[in-house]
Amino acid sequence: MEDSLLAHAVAYINEDGTFSGSSFSGAASPSLKPLIREAAKAVPDPRGPGTVYEVWLRRNKGDTTDLTLGNLGGGSDFAGFYHHLGIPAGGIGFDAPNGIYHSMYDSYDWMSRFGDPGYRSHRAGAQLVAVMAARLANAELLPYDYVAFGTELIQLVSQLDSGLARKQWTVSTQGLKDALGRFTDAARALARVRDSALAAPDSARAARANAALMQVERRLTRPEGLASRRWYRSLQFASDVDNGYATMPFPSVNEAIRYADPATAERELADLTARVDRARAALEDATAALR
């Protein structure tokens, strides 16, 4: 099964107890966040007026910078796909601060009377998942956004810098920042070529490009896993080692900082930097396939 998933799976859409209110939210690999936002523009909000995206925007007073989607932590079924195999994953839902989840009141009766009367949020959620699945399945070129991915990871390096500064170590993240900059530049080059390729479709070129794109996040995994948890192979995100639900970016480095091990932090930064460059090479392979 693992070999089949690595060879063929393009994404995993996770839906786990996510319809208990009226406020749209989601979490995903950064490469899939733009896909979720675009899907939200295509589905009517269950309470309206307008689309899910438009209601989301109004809730944030029109500030698109606040239309954030979270990063995946743990405690759900995406872990096997995302943390273990490096398959991009994401999920959406409609929630509310009701405190019912995983309680004795989490029942059909509560949901039908209070959580989602008429099951309107459930219907909108199913429509959103259908839009995402259709766009992933039918796209000439897989709709990953690696410009968004690289940009977000560059921003998250600041968390490493803060942790290193608190420890007063001389360990530098500059090599990782440079590698992520090269990655993002390669993603921008791919985006330019992608637009031209979609204007003149070529199925053989698209197949080669898609095969390369599927390797990008897989190349950010390590077969031997994290030092603390061998099953967790992804080096981009994991669940927090001290909180199974929270997310931890760059877990191999962050855990070394938490455990006060500067030599391991430096070694893990070098390993992560090399893997980012390997992921960039996959982007360059996709670009070359489309030229």
Where are these regions (language model features)?
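Secretory-pathway/membrane protein signature
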Residues: 1-291
